[in-house]
Amino acid sequence: MAQSVLQPNTEWTARFAHISWVQRWNSLLQSPLFVVLVSLLTVIGNLFGLELAAYTVLVLLGIGVFLFGRDLLPVMSIVVSCYIMPGVHNNPGRTEESIFYPQNGGIYILILAGLAVACLVYRLVRDQELGGKAFLKRPRKLLPGMLVLGAGYLLSGAFSGRYFENGIYNMAFALVQFLSVFLMYWIFSGTVRWDRVRSDYLAWVGLGAGLTVCCQVIGVYIENQVITEKTIHTGLITTGWGNANNMGCIIAMMIPFAVDLSHRSKYGWVYSTIGVLMIGFTCFTCSRTSIMAAVLIYIVAMLFALRDPRRRKDLIIANSVLLALLVLLLIFHGPMSQLFTELLERGFNPRLRDVIYVDGMQVFRDNPIFGESFYPSVDSIYQFSNVAAMQTILPARWHNTVIQLLASGGVVSLACYAVHRVQTAKLFWKKRKSDGIYISLSVTALLVMSLLDCHFFNDGPVLFYSMALAFLENVKFNK
């Protein structure tokens, strides 16, 4: 359903009302076209090694939003793009030529970030409708649970004797994890005019991010020569911001948004088909957890979509495409089996997960109240993660949210997480009969994958999670 993207001027933007380009700028910002442009910029920066130039443009766009935007909603797509921007050639863990090292561009990136933050602070201080006391007083129903969760993170390892064993890293990691959950929710809840937001805006942000990563999968296959001797070598599926599991996670999370958008356009079958193709790209990440989540979440999203009889034709077309792909898979069973040999050989092999889960529970039994800290002492988890985990400031993680919480923070951390999760579950239930259900499904995909991986303790997916909660809580959706 088409919705107006024009908003009345606020006191802040009234001063620019007579400038025609500012009005056109705001119309662009509130439309899906802006998300498309940001996504294209991210693809170009990632595939062609132009990250520094792309970051510069993204920051300039962000400053344009901070200074001239009616609100800060368009920054959502910029935040996601900044995370998924780095390409293979700039992975700081694989090359010393990465732009993220100070001598190669790291200082410049920090300057860009500082400039963006300064403009954000300026807007919050000067704009009394979105900033100032109004910002602080905006209702944030999920905030209490997030603060409780943050306290649980910061107490992880207290009284275990390991809290400061790695210096301030344990506290710093806990703080970063808390900010990942809290910061975007806190900022956007107070800086967006939610009564004027089009209800499909986050769906466009999510779909843009998902398709961007799909393009990156193609780039990774070419750049890293992933296929040799007609076989996919899964260890080569890595980009500048994450490995195969990270890429698969982002794509799987965004599949519900393709289904959501299918009823908002007369070309709904296009979006439904995109959802099916995103499942295919998830398969080419060879991330087993992501593949499982992508298929399950697509099926559930499709079942919800079938409630609307207007969507059924589009979904029939999309599922016909899926059926055709399955038929082709059967016809070319031999070559496809060879192509995915490594994935098929893994099957349901836990690959040491069963070992580290047992060790994680033993760590919990040894430190039941506050856990051991985010920096494990047992050897098995480093064997699972790889040797590099012992040489980085980032801790090895337990690849299961519950065990991570118990081993790192004990029953206190798990209880704090439960408070936050109960609040989000209530929100999901409240929105279950509206189009907000697709945001709930995206978040559910993240939580399901995090039962076999460490995505809830990776910043990128959780930044989107934080924004999604703000959007879900505040927007009025169609039922």
Cite the ranges covered by each PLM segment.
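Aromatic-anchored transmembrane helix interface
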Residues: 104-114, 141-153, 165-190, 204
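Flexible juxtamembrane loops connecting transmembrane helices in multi-pass membrane enzymes
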Residues: 231-238, 329-359, 379-382
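Hydrophobic transmembrane alpha-helices and their immediate junctions
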Residues: 311-315, 319, 408-447
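Alpha-helical transmembrane segments of multi-pass inner-membrane proteins
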Residues: 37-40, 62, 150-154, 158, ...
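Transmembrane alpha-helices of multi-pass inner-membrane enzymes
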Residues: 36-39, 256, 420, 436-451, ...
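A membrane-periplasm/extracellular boundary helix in multi-pass inner-membrane enzymes
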Residues: 217-220, 284-285, 305-346, 361-365, ...
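N-terminal signal-anchor transmembrane segment
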Residues: 3, 7, 23-124, 155-157, ...
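Long extracytoplasmic/lumenal interhelical loops at the membrane interface
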Residues: 346-358, 365-366, 370-409
